[in-house]
Amino acid sequence: MPRRLFPISLVLLLLLLALAAFPAFPAWAFSLTGEENTLSQIRGLLDLAAGSIRPGLDLRPDTPIEHADVNPYGINTFLHQEVEPAKREKQVQLLAEAGFHWLRQEFPWYDIEISGKGNFEDCRFPPCHPAWDKYDQIVDLTEAHGLEIIARLSSPPSWTRADGDARGPFAPPDNFADYADYAAAVAERYKGRIRYYQLWNEPNIYPEWGEQAVNPESYTELLCAGYAAIKKVDPEAVVLAGALAP
């Protein structure tokens, strides 16, 4: 949380704690946050208040673009969660037959650089093997079926945070340079095979930025670090900001 917002947030917290004693508070807070638990309601109201006092976005006017003559149909996939390669192949085949062209496929950091920085071996279930193996197969399958991947780079391993998973498994790493190095490793391995990368997922909602308030300033810092790292190893790559929740 930016330092300038801390005193304001503290005052708001005290006010909300006082309001919570009134009988009408739960219904009012639920209407704004959708939460039923009192502490969750207070946290949601604090997030709303913090968002309302942040500087507004400085956006350029919309620029009309020509229609791109490409297949517009895509789907979220989690092919890495399928244990059996044959079933993974069948899923990709069905997606191609259904008319999809774009697969927004996660390349979760915790499943690639698993136990420490620079270690791309998976030893969770001996014998050890390269953590890249399943992702290599996913890329092979999409190419074989004429599909394209939008690689979602998210979900840090616990070693990237001094407090482990205390702030939740989706909390950002302590050092954004570690994220940049992971993003660069993925982009370098699949240079010329994956063109599109999306950095993080829904960083504007809880708990996608961890068990803490969302922080657009910090996310922007992470986005810039990842962008620079990917473009350095693959100048032709297209780097996308994380998809935002409505």
Task: Name what the model sees in each region.
Residues 26-102, 117-119, 125, 140-144, ...:
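N-terminal carbohydrate-binding accessory modules
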Residues 10, 26-29, 111, 175:
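A generic alpha-helix propensity feature with a strong bias for hydrophobic helices
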Residues 98-121, 125-246:
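Substrate-binding cleft and catalytic face of glycoside hydrolase catalytic domains
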Residues 6-7, 91, 107, 155:
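Sequence-pattern detector for short linear motifs
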Residues 9, 23, 31, 40, ...:
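Generic serine detector
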Residues 15-27:
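Hydrophobic alpha-helical membrane-insertion segments, chiefly the h-region
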Residues 3, 19-22, 231:
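Generic N-terminal simple sequence motifs
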